[in-house]
Amino acid sequence: KDYASDLWINTQARAVAAKTVGIKALTFNFETIQGKIYVAGITARPDLLDEMTVALKNIKGVNEIVNYVIIREKL
């Protein structure tokens, strides 16, 4: 049950990222373990990361978001 639930949460996380940050969502990786979403990637837009994190927390079954995203300087 946990695996199926985590897989569904992961699928929803990718959809939320695509809706929130658009094509740049491809720069993020998601892994869900027991309702905890691990997010990794690189972005120059911390505002979009914050918006995406809020949206991820609203996914049913999500207990926690663990952020491993690196914020890089805009060139």
Place the predicted regions along the sequence by residue:
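N-terminal targeting leaders
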Residues: 1-75
